[in-house]
Amino acid sequence: MMTILQRTLLSALVAAAAASAQTVNCVVAVVNGQIITLADVEVVAAFGLGDPPGAEAGTDPRHAALDTLIDQKIVLDVARETRAVSKADVAAARLDLARRLGDKEFGTKLARFGLRPQDLDPYLEGRLLFERALALRFSSTIPVSVTEVERHYRDIYVPEQTRAGGPVQPLDKVAETIEARIRGERRAAQTGSWVRDLRKSADIQIKKDCLK
């Protein structure tokens, strides 16, 4: 008799194979009993849904896509309170993606995988849920002192603008922008640290041969 995991695995493979006829499918990872297929990884990579900030140019985008999908699963496992995204939100995300890529490129990528636009909805929904879970957990205001803003202006903003040959605005004109940048960087660091801690306690099995 098939176990629940085996039945889930079989169903996911069949569904992914139907949606991506040109991809030789296999299981790339199992995260807390949830599978990630090669088709999942390649779709997320192709449509730019798994590009982390600071990803190095020239690296295989599938690795970033796999990391994104793993992070989504482990975060949503613990963020039980974030479980609903409206159809309207998903549809809006799909339209935004199509606009970002352009109609021609969007259509080409869909054809490559044998997908309809709405077949992207599960990936978009997962991304929206993930982003909302992080926003909910790290929603409190991160304090930034005046001294930090002044230091960033002196040590980072002015040198950056000088190297780029751009105008150097006075501090009072860019203080809010600098404060937001510092806060964003700090929130990203906190988020990254939390997700790394979740990974340590998660059951993650990666099948490296599948990505070769």
Identify the role of each PLM range.
Residues 24-27, 59-212:
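Peptidyl-prolyl cis-trans isomerase
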Residues 31-32, 53, 57, 81:
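A short N-terminal beta->alpha junction/helix N-cap motif
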Residues 23-42:
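Short N-terminal segments immediately surrounding and downstream of signal-peptide cleavage
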Residues 45-60:
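Short, conserved catalytic-motif segment at the N-terminal edge
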Residues 1-9:
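Bacterial N-terminal signal peptides that target proteins for export
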Residues 12-21:
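Hydrophobic h-region of N-terminal signal peptides that target proteins for export
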Residues 32, 46-49, 70, 74:
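Short amphipathic alpha-helical segments enriched in leucine
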